[in-house]
Amino acid sequence: EMSASLVGSEMCIRDSPESVLTGEVGNMIIENFLNDIAGIKTTKTKSAALPDSERVELKKYLKIVCDGKSLTEDEAYKAMDIIMSDRASNAQIACLLTALRMKGETIDEITGFAKVMREKMSKVNVKGTLDIVGTGGDLSNSFNISTTSSFVIAAAGQKVAKHGNRSVSSKSGAADVLEALGVKIQSTHEQAEKSLDEIGLSFLFAQSYHSAMRFVGPTRAQIGVRTVFNILGPLANPAKADFMILGTYDPDLLEPMAKVLMNLGIKRAMLVYGNDRLDEVSISAPTTICEVNGGKLIKYEIKPEDFGLKRGKLADIVGDDGKGNAAITRGILEGTIKGAKRDIVLLNSGCALYICGKCDSIEEGVKTAAEMIDSGKALKKLEELVELTNRG
């Protein structure tokens, strides 16, 4: 039986889920990794004060994964619930994350993990929202394309619940650029709901909505390698967005991530991979798309030229730090920045307007996006968000 699994950010197809991580040998390999490489002592953990009856809960799931086997969705759900309820030690968490990466995370495992994150998060109760987000890790150092696109999409009448964080691997995360634009990024779920109702746009700062992540953060920082959490973030939008544009730098993640979104009940989504390794719809290469629509997966490829846009170069969309990228975003919305930077925003916005049903095609979406910028409506959305979030 063929089994598909995700290794951090890579997908492995193999004939069986068995691996070298079996029995005592597997446990020894992982413990040596934790002690010698990650610097996490397995004998001294933050949860040492917990009674043994609580600290042993995760062990049966650790054994399954360390034996090279995969968790069922229900087992993955229970394991993540233990972790995000502060009932596991740092070493146990590190062991599980490392073993999962070495084995390769399955669609069922990611689905189970994501369901727990969505249950534990502070929720924003507004229906019909869209999120446009990337997994990161494409190493392109591009400006904040999806954040800039959010203003264009909202100007066209689609509610955007932009979920994001500060920079981790790049110079500027969504939170960094919005803060530099004058947006107050910290918000309660009530404030976010008000913003979505009043102006059709809100930034959902991940740290404000995922308090249970504090039980995982220190371990992730100490491990210092990609884990399943790198792809869980986009799957846990506090508004449970009905529509999504989700970019990845790895084409092998397209179909698995699409299937996870289907498991989570997404209405329509577009998983995108720029063939130049961009986790956005690319202006400098064809883009491979896996569209989720009506419970079906449709895979196809698009090019900038298909929509009357001139192909650019990756160097044309390189960004800066938060302040520099804020200037790029404002320049595009004001109409002073043209060329590839504007065009890639039009392309990504156009795809979003198509996937949420505001436009009947990507081509129509691109034209609508251009109208939103040229009319000043997209810039007005930025000004409205700044004013609303800073209101006393």
Could you tell me what each predicted segment is?
Residues E1-I13:
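Short, small-residue-biased leader/transition segments that mark boundaries at the very start
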Residues S16, G137, G233:
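Active-site glycine-centered loops adjacent to acidic/histidine catalytic or metal-binding residues
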Residues P17-P51:
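Acyltransferase
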Residues V25, I29, I145-S149, G173-A174, ...:
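Catalytic-loop motifs flanking and including active-site residues across diverse enzymes
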Residues P51-S142, A154-A156, V160, R311-G319, ...:
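Acidic, glycine/proline-rich low-complexity segments that act as flexible tails and inter-domain linkers
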Residues L97, F143-I199:
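A glycine-rich phosphate/pyrophosphate-binding beta-strand-loop-alpha-helix module
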Residues E119-S122, S142, G157, E179-Q186, ...:
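Glycine-rich anion-binding loops and their surrounding alpha/beta cores
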Residues G134-L139, G164-S170, Y209, N275-D276:
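Acidic, glycine-rich active-site loops and adjacent beta-strand->loop/helix elements
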